[in-house]
Curated annotation (Swiss-Prot):
All residue ranges annotated as the Histidine kinase domain in the record: 189-409
Record-given protein name: Sensor protein kinase WalK
Compartments where located: Cell membrane
Residue stretches making up the PAC domain: 132-185
GO biological process, one term: cellular response to phosphate starvation
Nucleotide-binding recorded as keyword: yes
Organism: Mammaliicoccus sciuri (Staphylococcus sciuri)
Cellular component, GO annotation: plasma membrane
Upper classification of the organism: Bacteria, Bacillati, Bacillota, Bacilli, Bacillales
Membrane topology field: Multi-pass membrane protein
Gene3D superfamilies: 1.10.287.130, HAMP domain in histidine kinase (1.10.8.500), Histidine kinase-like ATPase, C-terminal domain (3.30.565.10), PAS domain (3.30.450.20)
Amino acid sequence: ITIVLGFFIARTITKPISDMRNQTLEMSKGNYTQRVKIYGNDEIGELALSFNNLSKRVQEAQANTESEKRRLDSVITHMSDGVLATDRRGRVRIINEMALKMLGLECADVEAKHILDILNIDDDYSLDDLQENNDSFIIDINSEEGIIARVNFSTIIQDTGFINGYIAVLHDVTEQHILENERREFVANVSHELRTPLTSMRSYIEALEEGAWRDPEVAPTFLNVTREETDRMIRLVNDLLQLSKMDSSSDQMNSELINFNMFINKIINRHEMSQGKNVTFIRDIPVKGLFVEIDPDKMTQVFDNVITNAIKYSQESHKRVEFHVKQNTLYNRMTIQIKDNGIGIPVNKVDKIFDRFYRVDKARARKMGGTGLGLAITKEIVEAHKGRIWASSKEGQGTSIYITLPCEVMEDEFGDWDA
């Protein structure tokens, strides 16, 4: 009897302890859902109850941790900045999609690789440098795509002072970098374009002050050059003001529906009359009316710019300007081609002619009185009309300027418009 009673008494003690041991093993595997059976209200029962409460709290804490982790993963995934997290040795453990996109890499390319190697800054920095330097810096992280990023590093440090890892945040500043370069280049160009005529005018005025005004042959020439340079500065300032208005969207568009055939023919007629027999104008324009919604004044400026350039750069012996207008009925758009028979443009410079202040031949352009802004303004106006402008050229074979605009063919109940 004593042995039997001893067995049952021992079992009432060992069974709950065995259950708690099994539950501890389950918890070590990450399973917090099971509970220990409570056999009584004695000390072992209270221990089992406390164990269950502990298990419940750990389960809740684990659930909160998982929830926070998912939330953090979601934030990192959808961030507009790139994020890389490393271990204490600098090996990448976490990288979001934006960082991969900015770096032009796949996940497999960065797995367990050193962050300094991935960012290609291992020659300039060490982990100790990043630890000591809290300032951000600019790096070219993807040369092929031309992506420039501002990188901010932070060190993950435990309460004990032990370094646990590093975090790098990549902010794409490519557009700001390009805009800043364009701004500097623009200011430099404006300064140069204003300084050149001012220097020339100053020289002539000083010569006149020193007595050149008494020379009946020299004085008129000096005054004429001064007037021409003044006119060029006025044109430059006016062009700059127009570009400024377009950039700030304060330039009002007064659009109206017009017959484009009549519109373009009127412009060509004006240039034909002013040029006389010096220039041959060839027209390939449909008779049926093509209607466009445009600002007539601004689009007149566009075609005047393009036609004037075509005349300027055509062959001196026999200037010829061709006009070809074609409609794409599928997309309700038309293409205007204005072609000259001039000196042409090198292939590597064709795409740059619409840049502000760009000139293929600077000396010749200045001699002809150009500001270097005409085609830039032309492009802004065309794009404001939901159109597109581009050029095609070969050296010695002339240049073609193409302009596409939205259009419609409207049936006129009174008959076709006479172009």
